[in-house]
Amino acid sequence: MHFVFTGTESTFKSTIAKKIAMHFNLLYIPEFARTYLEEISPNTQINPIARKDYNLIEEGQLALLSSQGYFDSNQPKVFDTDGTVLHIWKTDKFDDIDYKLLNIPSHIIYFLCYPNVEGAYDPLRMDLERRDVLHEQYVNVLKELPNTTIHLNQETLEERLRFATTEIERLLNDSI
């Protein structure tokens, strides 16, 4: 099984994913969009993002998922995003519904991070004021998938991390 942390911007996803990976000594696979925007193409305009840049991010994220064993259930791993984020982003920004992005393996366990925490400014964030609306899209997409979704709606990073750790311990113990 693999653990995917998903949800809107500024909900502690990346921080929790990294800490969980360290705690359980699991491979952490980062979000490609941030790598693209910070390292590969740092001068990219993000609001609005050009379709060509989105396409490069989608291509990079899908290649990263594939190369890091997302579709292979061996060895648990922690992913900081997957095709669900791309599906929601593509639908929201370009009105392009791409169900291929929702071809999710059955061994994926989702941790949906809620936007009930204060959003922190980051120059790469573009939808802080729309987190509640976008969160509903995540809820709806994840409801349609057969995968398990664990909701992280605690009000602090520490509480979310504690809850996620407990849930992952339970899942890992149940799989033995």
What feature does the model see in each segment?
Residues 12:
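Conserved glycine(s) of the Walker
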Residues 5:
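Hydrophobic anchor at the beta1->P-loop junction of P-loop NTPases
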Residues 18, 22-64:
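Conserved substrate/cofactor phosphate-moiety recognition/catalytic segment
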Residues 15:
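Conserved Walker
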Residues 151, 165-176:
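C-terminal accessory "lid"/substrate-recognition subdomains
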Residues 9:
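The conserved Walker
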Residues 94-159, 172:
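A glycine- and Lys/Arg-enriched "phosphate-lid" helix/loop adjacent to the NTP-binding pocket
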Residues 58-105:
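Glycine-rich phosphate-binding loop used to anchor ATP phosphates in small-molecule kinases
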